[in-house]
């Protein structure tokens, strides 16, 4: 048999391979290229793509566009007003009847260097979450799947991009034609509230027509089971300042007489949420869309993780009296910070001049950000608060006993896609094929991703492909990516490219 005939036969054999065959072939490819794949993630993490570094964001966008070009994609870089570029890619697959858009973001959260065990932009491999540093480049594969690569963006969200690229490379090496036309949208402003995303998507709506959006963001279920999700909670931030005296006052001379803004803030918190974490603001949840039977069944099938997580987090109790996933289906109020007076060595016996509460609300389908703001402000006024937008002057202070300044941050609503649609069934089947068994199916991720924008503009199913480990320290110091999760991500993306159909 000549070489050309042998090559053609190899392609024919590879073409109709079963799901199990593809999974095994992709895993074999990955095993043979582990060092190169980790090297690609290492290289990407070294690019400083955080909001404070516009040059780093631009360089990262250019790097990623080049990665798509070398793989045969038609590419473009979309930006407006100096915003970080959105990297777009298109690869048509002959005969494909569906088009899937693969979304991820390449920007990361800001860093506080003193809190990191190592330079966040010089990736380090460790043998566990609190493990020792490893010289992985000198080690021989296969690498221990429990090893973790530490660095900003390693999990959120650069690992999704590398999984996509590695999966594409695997399919090309295996001569597997994608079952869908592939479009790529990689954003550089997600961690900064996606300020320009809506406008750019509207401008390029024609290029972004598809049958499904696949979102590469978020962690897998805490059981470490391969996971897909069908939505995400919305988000809305609020900074509230409560005012006390014009200057700090000696608490021996004026305590019990001059109102203490820190105590007022503590009282306000207990009026917004009870001891079980449930929101007690009147009418707050009136507009919430209930879960469907299919969504409730999906939650009931999830592996229990609560006992293990209590040990991992060092807590004796949980709030709400329900499973973790069930609790994330409800709206929530989180007190993300309180500032008032002094503590520790700087503590003094004084009544502080103000107290600042930083709050984030998580929304669920049915709620809107304007509607939530109206309900919160109506609640405050009913409790006797005078709501202001600017720092109050003396006249205002003397006229009103309880003054609170509200500074609402950016936000967006929640989304839950239909878990029973044909596209959903196709994604579930491909994900199960990649996993080689059952997967965790979440009606909605507890965290927030601005996927509502995609829904409002394009009206197609939006489904998440999370791959990060649940303990990846996303947004915090010592962010990390567990290798087993990276390997699972490559298998997942390969299945979405080669087997997705409906």
Model-found features: residue ranges?
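A non-catalytic alpha/beta surface segment that caps or lines the substrate-entry region
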Residues: 40, 50-103, 118, 122
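Acidic/histidine-rich catalytic neighborhood of metal-dependent amide-processing enzymes
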Residues: 145-231, 501
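N-terminal hydrophobic or amphipathic helices/low-complexity stretches enriched
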Residues: 19-56, 71, 114-115, 232
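A short core secondary-structure module
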Residues: 255-276
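Active-site metal-coordination/substrate-binding segment of hydrolases
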Residues: 97-183, 488
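An extended, acidic, His-containing surface patch that forms the Zn2+-binding/catalytic region
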Residues: 222, 280-354, 367-378, 383, ...
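N-terminal signal peptide c-region/cleavage motif recognized by signal peptidases
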Residues: 14-17
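Bacterial N-terminal signal peptides that target proteins for export
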Residues: 1-6
């Amino acid at each position: 048999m000549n070489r050309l005939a042998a090559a053609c036969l190899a392609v024919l054999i590879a073409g109709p391979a079963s799901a199990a065959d593809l999974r095994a072939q992709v895993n074999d490819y990955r095993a043979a290229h582990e060092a190169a794949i980790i090297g690609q993630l290492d290289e990407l993490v070294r690019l400083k793509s955080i909001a404070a570094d516009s040059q780093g964001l631009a360089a990262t966008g250019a790097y990623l566009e080049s990665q798509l070009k070398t793989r045969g994609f038609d590419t473009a870089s979309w930006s407006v007003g100096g915003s970080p570029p959105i990297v777009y890619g298109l690869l048509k697959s002959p005969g494909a009847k569906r088009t899937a858009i693969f979304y991820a973001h390449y920007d990361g959260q800001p860093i506080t260097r003193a809190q990191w065990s190592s330079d966040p932009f010089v990736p380090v491999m460790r043998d566990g979450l609190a493990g020792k540093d490893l010289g992985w480049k000198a080690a021989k594969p296969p690498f221990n799947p429990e090893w973790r690569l530490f660095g900003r963006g390693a999990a959120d969200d650069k690992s999704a991009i590398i999984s996509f690229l590695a999966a594409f490379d695997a399919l090309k090496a295996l001569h597997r034609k994608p079952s869908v036309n592939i479009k790529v949208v990689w954003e550089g402003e997600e961690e900064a509230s996606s300020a320009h995303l809506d406008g750019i998507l509207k401008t390029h709506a024609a290029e972004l027509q598809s049958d499904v959006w696949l979102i590469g963001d978020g962690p897998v279920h805490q059981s470490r089971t391969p996971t897909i999700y069908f939505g995400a909670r919305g988000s809305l931030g609020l900074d509230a300042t409560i005012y006390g005296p014009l200057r700090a006052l000696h608490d021996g001379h004026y305590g019990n007489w001059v109102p203490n803004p820190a105590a007022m803030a503590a009282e306000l918190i207990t009026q917004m949420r009870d001891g079980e974490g449930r929101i007690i603001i009147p009418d707050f949840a009136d507009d919430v869309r209930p879960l469907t039977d299919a969504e409730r069944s999906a939650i009931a099938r999830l592996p229990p993780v609560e006992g293990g997580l209590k040990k991992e987090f060092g807590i004796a109790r949980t709030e709400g009296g329900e499973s973790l996933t069930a609790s994330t289906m409800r709206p929530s109020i989180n007190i993300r910070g309180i500032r008032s007076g002094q503590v520790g060595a700087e503590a003094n016996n004084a009544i502080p001049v103000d107290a600042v509460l930083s709050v984030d609300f998580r929304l669920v389908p049915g709620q809107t950000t304007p509607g939530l703001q109206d309900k919160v402000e109506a609640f405050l006024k009913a409790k006797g608060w005078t709501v202001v937008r600017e720092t109050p002057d003396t006249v205002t202070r003397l006229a009103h006993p309880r003054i609170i300044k509200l500074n609402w941050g950016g936000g967006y609503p929640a989304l839950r896609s239909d878990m029973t649609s044909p596209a959903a069934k196709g994604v579930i089947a491909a994900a199960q094929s990649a996993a080689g068994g059952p997967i965790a199916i979440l009606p909605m991720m507890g965290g927030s991703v601005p996927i509502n924008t995609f829904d409002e503009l394009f009206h197609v199913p939006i489904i998440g492909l999370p791959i990060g480990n649940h303990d990846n320290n996303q947004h915090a110091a010592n962010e990390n990516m567990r290798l087993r999760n990276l390997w699972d991500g490559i298998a997942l993306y390969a299945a979405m490219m080669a087997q997705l159909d409906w």
